[in-house]
Swiss-Prot record:
This is Probable flagellum biosynthesis repressor protein FlbT. GO terms for molecular function: mRNA 5'-UTR binding. Belongs to the FlbT family. Has a post-transcriptional repressor function in flagellum biogenesis. Associates with the 5'-UTR of fljK mRNA and promotes its degradation. GO terms for biological process: bacterial-type flagellum organization; mRNA catabolic process; negative regulation of bacterial-type flagellum assembly. It comes from Chelativorans sp. (strain BNC1). Keywords: Bacterial flagellum biogenesis, Repressor, RNA-binding. The keyword RNA-binding applies.
Length: 145
């Protein structure tokens, strides 16, 4: 971050800053004056919600941001996941996005990597939805509907 960055939080909201969890008891505005890794509560993905390939990738990167002390242990898992996704997806926008995520993580821009992954969710949903429709059509044909 090159400039200051201001965010507003509502009473009871949490923010994760450089691995620390901060909960506010009233509406506040925070201004970050230097580089900081943070994640708003609304962007935290719960383990049970990591139910698609990109959400699983997001969860891995999120762990790196929320627990920076364990980031080195998480990197091999991230590399394996990225390699698998790059080998599996055929959509050019997803592939370009995954390569961008990889470069952002390598540059230490973890929050930006999370934003880039979230931006790929709609494309992934289109792909998964088309796959589900195809499966349903095959099943219907097989059972004579």
């Amino acid at each position: 971050m090159k400039n200051t960055f201001r965010i507003s939080l509502k009473a009871g909201e949490k923010i994760y800053v450089n691995g620390a969890v901060i909960k506010v008891d009233r509406k506040v505005s925070l201004e970050f004056l230097n580089d900081v890794q943070f994640l708003l509560q609304q962007h935290v993905l719960q383990p049970e919600d990591a139910n698609t390939p990109l959400r699983q990738l997001y969860f891995i990167v999120q762990v790196m941001l929320m627990g920076p002390e364990g980031a080195d242990k998480t990197r091999p898992l991230l590399k394996d996941m990225l390699d698998n996704l790059l080998a599996t997806f055929r959509n050019e926008r997803i592939l370009a996005g995954l390569k961008h995520v990889d470069s952002l993580v390598c540059e230490g821009q973890i929050y930006e990597a999370l934003k880039a992954i979230r931006a790929l969710y709609p494309i992934e949903e289109e792909i998964l939805s088309a796959g589900r429709q195809q499966e349903q059509a095959i099943f219907a044909k097989a059972v004579g509907e």
